[in-house]
Amino acid sequence: MSIYFPIHCPDYLRSAKMTEVMMNTQPMEEIGLSPRKDGLSYQIFPDPSDFDRCCKLKDRLPSIVVEPTEGEVESGELRWPPEEFLVQEDEQDNCEETAKENKEQ
């Protein structure tokens, strides 16, 4: 034998209220779209002439300028190129310059 106990939790009460609202609202078929008082009907899709006018205003994309910062890197932030790569590159440049100087002498 099972006994049903009503659930008294906020979610259950909210869903019961929503069910009540859904049962008491007017069905969508009865709402319908009717012309406004001024006689104009509702327009769902944009007017093609508005589209052409809008496109003429957008001849180019806006430019965004991002300037590099010289501040310290926060921990966990990734940077490119990595500092180790820059150090290795500087060492290679120094080695190549030294080799050229030795050949010239």
UniProtKB/Swiss-Prot annotation:
Q: Which domain of life is it from?
A: Eukaryota
* Purpose: Transcriptional activator which may act in mitogen-activated protein kinase signaling pathway.
LBH domain spans which residues?
18-104
Q: Which UniProt keywords apply?
A: Cytoplasm, Developmental protein, Nucleus, Phosphoprotein, Transcription, Transcription regulation
What gene, per UniProt, encodes this protein?
LBH
Which species is listed as the source?
Answer: Homo sapiens
Query: Which body tissues produce this protein?
Result: Highly expressed in heart, and expressed at low levels in placenta, lung, skeletal muscle, kidney and liver.
InterPro entries linked to this entry: LBH, LBH_dom, LBH_dom_prot
> What subcellular compartments does it reside in?
Nucleus; Cytoplasm
Gene Ontology biological process = mammary gland epithelial cell differentiation; negative regulation of DNA-templated transcription; negative regulation of intracellular estrogen receptor signaling pathway; negative regulation of stem cell differentiation; positive regulation of DNA-templated transcription; positive regulation of mammary stem cell proliferation; positive regulation of somatic stem cell division; positive regulation of somatic stem cell population maintenance
- The segment annotated Disordered runs over 86-105
- Which residues are modified to Phosphoserine? S63
Q: Which family does it belong to?
A: Belongs to the LBH family.
Q: Where is the composition biased (Acidic residues)?
A: 86-96
Task: Provide a GO CC annotation, any one.
Answer: protein-containing complex
Name of this protein: Protein LBH
